[in-house]
């Protein structure tokens, strides 16, 4: 089977600094799930899979149960991919981990072989309502450091009722910062319940108003009427929550 693999989805860690209500690693935001096992992907296991996949072209560092950058072995995990010069890497993160210098060095190291998706669900006053436990200023500074060092970054946005009024402003900011694209999540992790990660108070997070509207496929891009607004020059595509649909 490994000899046929061309792209590989990797979960580097089950650790995370965030407490997003829709994530399976916690109880709708308040406390971690009882069955959650905290660990990092074994380096030997990753090395074995990569080395035995001769047709492998693309690797995705993502996380259903954690953030890749929270891994205690992320540098070594990245090195395993880096030393295979034919591999490209897509890294998904909330962006609120590591230092600006770390992000700068990452961009310089991988150059065009790396694309980072920063999960930013609004401006400073709104973002952390869902992305609990993250720091918007730190995310923006890390993204700037990565982009300014030559890195290719995409702004990933989950639309909710509480942040949809900021979509246009987020698109503008992404363009001003030099993001290469703005990504909407197709099937967001909406849940019936959402709680504050410290108090357990009900947050009442709801889907956005256009959640049930039909999206139109055109030239391999999924577009809705937001694409028609003149301020949008960045191609907007939608993808599923584990990013299994690619441009």
Q: In which residue ranges do the predicted regions lie?
A:
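SEC14/CRAL-TRIO lipid-binding/transfer domains and related phosphoinositide-recognition modules
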Residues: 1, 7-8, 12-13, 36-52, ...
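N-terminal pre-triad scaffold of radical SAM enzymes
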Residues: 1-26, 57-63, 242-247
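Radical SAM enzyme [4Fe-4S]-AdoMet core and its adjacent flexible, acidic
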Residues: 11, 26, 31-41, 51-52, ...
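A short, conserved beta-strand element in the Rossmann-like catalytic core
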Residues: 21, 68-69
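Buried hydrophobic side chains on well-structured beta-strands
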Residues: 59-61, 67, 91, 118, ...
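Acidic donor-diphosphate engagement hotspot in glycosyltransferases and nucleotidyltransferases
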Residues: 73-74, 102
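Short beta->alpha connector loops
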Residues: 94-98, 161-163
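Alpha-helical scaffolding within the catalytic cores
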Residues: 98-106
